[in-house]
Structures are given as structure tokens and as C-alpha cells.
Amino acid sequence: MPKVKAAKNEHPMNDHPPHDHPHSHPPTDWKHDGVRVVPGNQLDGNVPSTPGMERKAAINFARVGAQKLWAGTVTIHANAKTGAHHHGHLESVIYVVKGRARMRWGEHLEFTAEAGPGDFIYVPPYVPHQEINASPTEVLECVL
């Protein structure tokens, strides 16, 4: 099998210099432990949700063995909101697909920001926050 070599600056997130030295990793079954594709019509809706919300998991431990990541979709009905919560040591990224998101955060949820279609929201570890659908009539659709 040919040796795979990283191309210089091939990806904007590649902050490691290319190298040719061997790694002391155990053998990997790339067929089963490599790239995974989860079709959009096969998301798992059997995940905890707040009333007025529909969550569907795409990437998590149960689906693909992810250790530090949860990704999926959420639909929040008009005027619905989550309870105040945080995600422990994990960071979160939310991409707004449709609708208007209102985020509240802080010890007493005293800070507020809004985001619309095409906007990204970053939530740092341990930050208490609440997601709110800011519209009284439209659903809010996001990818997390």
C-alpha cells in the first residue's frame, strides 16, 4: 500500500507541519475506523429533547463512536425555548439554517444576542445558556 503524505497547507485548519516519521499508533482498520457518512434521512430522533424542540443526532458515540463530539439538527417551534443549561467541557457551534435564534447566557442569563440564517453561534465550555426561537410564527432550524 502506498504511503499517504500530507500536502503542505492543503487545508486551512491544518496547523501541523508535514512530516514523514512513523507514528507509534496501533494498526487501524481504515474501512471501519475511517471517514463516516451519515445520510440526512437516517438521523436518530431518539435523543433527549425539550418540549417544543425536535433533536436528531447525526454524529455521536452511539452512531459513529465519536468521543468528544455531538452533531445533529434541532428544530425549535415558534416561541419555544430550552431551559438554562451548559455542555460541560465541550464547545458548541450552532449554524442557523432558517428562522431567528435568540441566545441568552451568563450566570443569570443576563446577556442576549440574536442570529439569523447563515450565522454561526459559538458557545464556550461551561457557559450557562438558553436557546430561544425569537419568532412567534416560524420554526427555527439549526445544525449543531
Map each language-model feature to its residues.
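Residue-level recognition of conserved beta-strand positions in structured domain cores
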Residues: 73, 86, 105-107, 125, ...
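Short strand-connecting beta-turns/loops that link adjacent beta-strands
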Residues: 63-64, 89, 108, 136-137
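A structure-centric signal for secondary-structure junctions around beta-strands
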Residues: 68-70, 90, 139-140
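A short, N-terminal "cap"/entry segment at the start of jelly-roll beta-barrel domains
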Residues: 2-68, 83
